[in-house]
Amino acid sequence: MIKKELGRSGIQVPALTFGGNVFGWTVDEATSFSLLDALVANQLNFIDTADVYSSWAAGNKGGESETVIGNWLKKSGKREQVIIATKVGKPMGAGKQGLSPRYIRQAVEDSLRRLQTDYIDLYQSHDDDRDTPLTETLAAFDELIKAGKVRAIGASNYQADRLVEALQVSEQNGLARYDTLQPEYNLYAREGYEKALEAVAQQHGLGVINFFSLASGFLTGKYRSVKDIGKSQRGDTIVTRYLNPRGLRILAALDQMADKYRTTPAQISLAWLIARPSITAPIVSATSLQQLDELVGATRLQLQAADIRALDEASRVG
């Protein structure tokens, strides 16, 4: 498995990041443990989660994903074999959100307790917090790194101008800097990242671990008509957003490439992302070992330059 560095952090990660939002939500603990064991066995040992996962599920309040991962770490004893990324900032109850130093200090202790570890490899701002000065937020993160509780920090859902400002604040004040960026990016949703964020990431040497890599499942080819709405709880939203002339054009190109490489649209979509020079490790999830095997296959797939250009053209906006 080829490894890439997360920004300038010195942390080496595989070609894909596993999205831990499924833990405590769409897979039970036993299945989660099987998936985590299989990830390590296949060298896909970079796991991304967040304190807020999976608060949206009935009966949950947040922290479920971290708890499952922590239980697995305790049972397996494989802490040194995995890279754990989590996030802070989303609402976790009354007065528990944002990026104030007080809350960051509280939230990191909660995450460490749930994960049953004494350090987090990558600690990320889940959202920008414009109510807290960047200097205060970054100073709090810097404190965590110096204390050995966090190895590196990253930003998720930041706009380009604010990301640049944060990087400047770090440099001017001698504080830890964001080494990673987590934006939405896939073969369909390209403009938001490519228009401004990509240049910032490349100029400042940031590692990019993008989410919605398969456009909520649309790029797997699962949703091709309004009749497919019932295939998942998110079917209505997916069909409404992606099922249009451009989306169908992308699916047609993926089908053509899948036939050529004797693989699946999902693997082609991920291979396209992996081939992007600015992308470090796209985030993608699985709920079964069969789906996980498909992810592993994507890391071995190398698209020809002409085919990458064909996918670029098929997904062009406008």
Where are these regions (language model features)?
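Active-site mouth loops of central-metabolism enzymes
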Residues: 20-30, 91-102, 131
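Short, acidic/polar
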Residues: 28-39, 99-114, 163-168
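A short acidic, helix-capping loop that chelates divalent metal ions and anchors anionic groups
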Residues: 53-58, 91-96, 294
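N-terminal binding-site loop/beta-alpha segment at the start of enzyme catalytic domains
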Residues: 1-81, 146
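Active-site groove signature of glycoside hydrolases
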Residues: 112-131
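Beta/alpha (TIM)-barrel catalytic core signal, keyed to glycine-rich beta->alpha loops juxtaposed to Asp/Glu
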Residues: 132-318
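Active-site beta-loop-alpha junctions enriched in small/polar residues
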Residues: 21-23, 52, 87-91, 125-128, ...
